Amino acid sequence: PPQAGRPVLSDLKIALDPGHIGGAWARMEERFLSFQPGEAIQEGDLALITARVLQERLAALGAEVVLVREQPEPVTLQRPGDLMAEAAEILKEMGILNPAQSYEGLAGDAKSQTLQWQAEKLFYRVSEIHARAGRVNERIKPDLVLCLHLNAESWGAAEAPQFSPQNHLHILVNGCYSAVELEQADVRFEMLRRIFQRAHEQELPLAAAVADGMAFATGLPAYVYTTPNARRAAGNAHVYARNLLANRLYECPVVYLEPYVMNHEETYRRLIHGHWLGRTLIGGRLQTSALEDYAHGVVHGLTAYYQKHRRP
C-alpha cells in the first residue's frame, strides 16, 4: 500500500500495450477502415493515442507507466518475408502443397490460402505478440498490463465497408481453454504457469473494476459472445474469459479491453476526430471524444480498485 498522503497508484508499474501496429501496417493487419476518400481510422493508431493519454493520467496518479510500443511500428524484428517457410508448412498441413505466392486479385478462401497471407498473419499475430511478451516479461516487468484495443463488427469488403448498428463493450481475462488448444504442449505450459503465478487472483477483480469504469464512462452495453471460445467471468456482464496469445504469454495480470464498434456510424465519426477534451459538434449534436471516454473509464476503474485494495 502507498504511504498516507501519496497518490493511489504510487509504486505501481503499469504497462500499456496499444493493440495492433497501425501506421503503414494497418491495411495488412485488416485494421484500416474508410467510408470515403480522404478519411480513415486505424485501430493501431487509435490505440496508441489512447495509450499516450493514459500514460499521462496514470503517471499523475503516481504510477510508473511504460508503453510496450511507442510508435506505429512492429516490436518484432521479423518481417513476413522471414516467415515463408513456416507459412508453407501451415498450408501443407491444410493439404495445400503448391500455394500461390501472392494474394493480389484474390479474396476469401483463395486469399487465405496464399503464402503471402499466411506469412503476414504469422508476422502480426504471432511473431509480434511474442516480441511484445519478451519486452513485457524481460524488460518492463510490470505489475499489470492493459491491452488497449477497439472492437468491430464484420464490415464486408475493405473497399466497400458497411456500417453496423451494434456498439458494445467487453473486457477479457485469460481462460476458457479448449480441448484442441490444450493438445499443444506450449499452451498447456503457459496455462499452468499462469495458474501457479496466481495472476487470476488480481486479474479477475481488476477486470471487473475496469469494466465498471468503462461502462460508466462510455455508456456501452455488454457484448454477448455466442461462440464457445469465451465464457463470462468475474461475475460481471462485461467480462469474459478467453484464451488469447497476449493474455496467456504476459507473466502478470492482464486486462484486455475491447470497447466500441469502429464501424458503428456514430462511433466512426467520433473516432475520425481523434482525441479532444470537452465536446464538439458531430452529427448535429455536441459529443465527447470516444478516446477520452475510453481513458476516463480506465482511470476510473483502476482508481476504484486500488483505493479499495491499497489502503495505507
Predicted features along the sequence, with ranges:
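Active-site histidine-acidic residue metal-binding/catalytic motifs
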Residues: P2-R135, S154, A158, S164-H168, ...
